[in-house]
């Protein structure tokens, strides 16, 4: 509970400092994006900003399971945030064609291209909405470098950056 309060207080300070009334998050259905979404909703509630101003986006890709996608959508609906679904499959497949990468080769190019496409979507929607991209990566991922450069390591405010994955 104390960690949630610290995260919420930090996000509130940032939102107030830049006079921001909207947030954009990529929601995967995993622990990190769930925590980031909960903190964002708590911050918006404390600021009296409608939850609809929190834009949660699930971005199914080439390896997305029904379970994680369902978890993401269910969580966003229960919390009453704006829910969007944008598939990255067509864009990533086109990218693979453009660079000559075989999509059957599931290497770092395969994984990282999807993360980068998702980040581009989040940044573009934040620009459209005059919102803040809330990062979901945690301290353990940042410390170990377990993220995609120009992908999920990028955000406008990394709300989980001080929280280890435990």
Regions found by a protein language model. Name each.
Residues 1, 18-27, 56-58, 102-108, ...:
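Glycine- and acidic
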Residues 1-26, 42-52:
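RNA-binding accessory domains that recognize and position tRNA/RNA substrates
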Residues 44, 79, 103-166:
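Active-site adenylate/phosphate-handling loop in enzymes that bind or generate adenylated species
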Residues 49, 53-109, 115, 141:
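A conserved beta-strand->alpha-helix junction
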Residues 22-24, 53-55, 82, 130-133:
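Beta-sheet entry/capping signal
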Residues 21-33, 89-92, 138-140:
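A glycine-rich phosphate-binding loop feature that marks nucleotide/adenosyl-phosphate handling sites
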Residues 27-40, 66-71, 98-99, 148-151:
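Short glycine/threonine-rich loop-to-helix capping motif typified by GTGT followed
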């Amino acid at each position: 509970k104390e960690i949630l309060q610290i995260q919420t207080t930090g996000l509130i300070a940032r939102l107030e400092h830049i006079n921001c009334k909207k947030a954009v998050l990529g929601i995967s259905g995993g622990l990190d994006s769930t925590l980031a979404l909960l903190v964002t909703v708590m911050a918006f509630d404390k600021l009296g900003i409608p939850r609809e101003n929190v834009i949660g986006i699930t971005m199914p890709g080439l390896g997305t399971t029904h379970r994680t996608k369902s978890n993401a959508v269910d969580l966003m609906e229960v919390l009453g945030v704006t829910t969007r679904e944008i598939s990255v499959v067509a864009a990533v497949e086109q990218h693979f064609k453009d660079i000559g990468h075989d999509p059957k080769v599931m290497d770092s190019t395969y994984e990282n291209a999807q993360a980068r496409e998702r980040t581009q979507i989040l940044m573009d929607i934040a620009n459209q909405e005059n919102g803040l991209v809330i990062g979901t990566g945690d301290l353990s991922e940042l410390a170990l470098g377990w993220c995609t450069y120009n992908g999920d390591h990028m955000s406008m405010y990394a709300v989980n950056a001080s929280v280890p994955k435990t």
